[in-house]
Amino acid sequence: MPRSSLAQLAPLPRAFFNRDPRIVGRELLGKVLLRREGRAILAGRIVECEAYLGADDAAAHSAAGKTARNAVLFGPPGYAYVYFIYGNHFCLNVSCLPDGQAGGILFRALEPIAGVERMAANRQLEPSQLRLIASGPGRLAEALAVTRDRDNGKDMVSPKSDLRIVDDGFGAVEVRETPRIGITKSADLPLRYIVAGSPFVSGKRYL
């Protein structure tokens, strides 16, 4: 689909995110995460994400209750939750479940499909290094110029949002489930979702 057509697609509705994160995570695979940068469109097909189930999930940021840092997760579904980790990169999530239940999806990897040169430049890479542009949550955020100051609390369902998720009609993908990466609590739960066979997923663990 041409870049201009992607920009004209409506974002996924709030009802899409007002569900169990396990369902949302599986159904996000194959959808397009899109950033508008002025007249430019930066976009990638979602090939990897992780579900966080709310207060009952020991690995979730919401497990210890509501704080100033994680307040977005406790609000309505469909809002961007951005946090800074390891002192060097941001991670982008979207809130799920009804208001107050604090579920979420962490975006882990994209297959770049539009604005590739701009995304590569954001990562200080060449466009030919396609697999490295957004394979991993920190790389993904950097490629789309996501920061906490700019994007935390942003309504990704609003048609006016410069950060949204759209369905371009790509169709069904083969989904694989694996344990989540980089956590020590609830580490055995199969809540990481990947597009089977995609070369753009992060790392090689559980592939």
From Swiss-Prot:
EC number: 3.2.2.-
Segments passing through the bilayer: none
Superkingdom assignment: Bacteria
GO molecular function: alkylbase DNA N-glycosylase activity; DNA binding
One Pfam assignment: Pur_DNA_glyco
DNA repair is among the record's keywords: yes
Keywords tagged on the record: DNA damage, DNA repair, Hydrolase
InterPro entries: Formyl_transferase-like_C_sf, MPG, MPG_sf
GO terms for biological process, alphabetical: base-excision repair
Gene3D superfamilies: Methylpurine-DNA glycosylase (MPG) (3.10.300.10)
Residues annotated as signal peptide: none
UniProt similarity note: Belongs to the DNA glycosylase MPG family.
Protein name, UniProt field: Putative 3-methyladenine DNA glycosylase
Species whose genome carries this gene: Koribacter versatilis (strain Ellin345)
Lineage: Bacteria, Pseudomonadati, Acidobacteriota, Terriglobia, Terriglobales
